[in-house]
Amino acid sequence: MKLEKDNAMDRADTLEQQNKEANNRAEKSEEEVHNLQKRMQQLENDLDQVQESLLKANNQLVEKDKALSNAEGEVAALNRRIQLLEEDLERSEERLNTATTKLAEASQAADESERMRKVLENRSLSDEERMDALENQLKEARFLAEEADRKYDEVARKLAMVEADLERAEERAETGESKIVELEEELRVVGNNLKSLEVSEEKANQREEAYKEQIKTLTNKLKAAEARAEFAERSVQKLQKEVDRLEDELVNEKEKYKSITDELDQTFSELSGY
């Protein structure tokens, strides 16, 4: 009986020990479950933050795409404006070439008038012969002016007026020498003015070539800007300022061209006044 009691007590101790171990394992499991729950909550919070960041990044990407599309549109518009500027410069160059040709014709007419003056200097000829030679030279100058652009029609009419004045001068043969001297001096001044105008035309052509080269350089910069899309907006603003500057310079060149043309008209007007 005692043995059974001892055995029962041993089993009771064993069961009690096992119960304690089971309780310890249960507490440890509960702690692990609690830690896992905390970690799950943290992961959920992290997931929310990541999703929010992803949404924000997607929105920023959409905005960047819109900005890039707008920048590409502005670049395309600037390319078109540059093409129009190049075409405008080509037309200006053609007009300058035409003006240079007409200036050369006018210079040739002045040379013919100079040759006429030298003929008149020959004292061995009579006043009538000198006036006839002057009339013939002025007729040649008139023929050259009629072959020029419509803009020089007025010059031809003024030369005809000079021709009429010279015909009337035949009636004043004895006083014609002083008139011839004045005409010689005026022709010399006109020759100098024409040479100055030729130099001005040459400089204007050089400036046109320089501006054309600048626009080619600007076109290359625009192509480079397309490859650097992330800097497109800043590049577009910079190129816009450059295009505006070139447009202003082109307007100035057109004004200078008009000034040269007006000066040429004034020179012929002064020549015809005599």
UniProtKB/Swiss-Prot annotation:
Keywords: Allergen, Coiled coil, Repeat. The keyword Iron-sulfur does not apply. Pfam families: Tropomyosin. Transmembrane segments: none annotated. Residues 1-45 are annotated as: Disordered. Belongs to the tropomyosin family. Homodimer. This is Tropomyosin.
